[in-house]
């Protein structure tokens, strides 16, 4: 099984890391990316670890940061459709596939 991150979700990941680097420090930005990578490995190892959220999609909360990974398992891949801040624009990613 492989992890596929849609372009919009990758942009969100990069934007969040850039925000942490600009407003705090590079170490915090690197910690954010490392936390995302840890979560991605967890999701790949056990795709059903997160609760269902909005139909077939699932939401995995990052431990240290106020972000969630919105994904859904497909036949041979896990598709990440959003790296969503938990307090901003809920559900904006609904149309993504």
Language-model features: where?
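Basic/aromatic recognition patch in beta-strand/loop cores that engages polyanionic ligands
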Residues: 48-78
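Small, basic N-terminal interaction modules of short regulatory proteins
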Residues: 2-15, 38, 77, 93-97
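Short, flexible helix/strand-to-coil boundary loops that buttress conserved ligand/catalytic motifs
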Residues: 24, 47, 54, 84, ...
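Short proline/glycine- and basic residue-enriched helix-capping loop/turn segments at helix->loop/beta transitions
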Residues: 40-44
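Arg/Lys-rich, positively charged N-terminal/basic patches that mediate binding to nucleic acids
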Residues: 1-33
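Enriched for short, Lys/Arg-rich terminal
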Residues: 68, 72-97
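A generic structural signal for short beta-strands and their flanking turns/coil linkers
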Residues: 32, 39, 56-58
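Short, hydrophobic secondary-structure boundary micro-motifs
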Residues: 29, 51-53, 92
